């Protein structure tokens, strides 16, 4: 069994909890409070330290993509959806229908939404960039307010750089 490490990152839209194994990032999500189970940062694997560094660059508007090893598993369709999410450009959005089409099944809009919802690595796999076909912000595990913040942050970063 692989060792698991936990770290926290304070961002403007809220506290982020990151878990990593010895070979990659396992989860990254917004949380309300720190758990008592936390790792000593001296023992963090290189990719967890790198994740924190890349998040810092992202929130400073200096990073548009992430280059980190991820430990993810899901159905074939979920993996296709998550791969398509990573292709949505920084500062841009796509609809659930767009994602379903690119994942290979235009009729699987609801399934694409469910796969989006099952994403355990927020921000890095940018599920916040998916919006309704009507352009409305809907559903985000971190809350619609954070989704709006992230999208505005990305757009503002593009304008300011």
Which residue stretches match the model-derived regions?
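Histidine- and aromatic-rich ligand-binding microenvironments
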Residues: 89, 120-123, 135
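Short clusters of hydrophobic/aromatic residues that line enzyme substrate/ligand-binding pockets
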Residues: 68-70, 112, 137-140
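Basic nucleic-acid-binding alpha-helical/helix-turn surface characteristic of O6-alkylguanine DNA
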Residues: 1-107, 153, 157-161
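Major-groove recognition helix of helix-turn-helix-like DNA-binding domains
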Residues: 85, 109-118
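…primarily DNA-binding HTH/wHTH and HhH modules…
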Residues: 133-161
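Short Lys/Arg-enriched helix C-cap and helix-to-coil transition segments
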Residues: 123-130
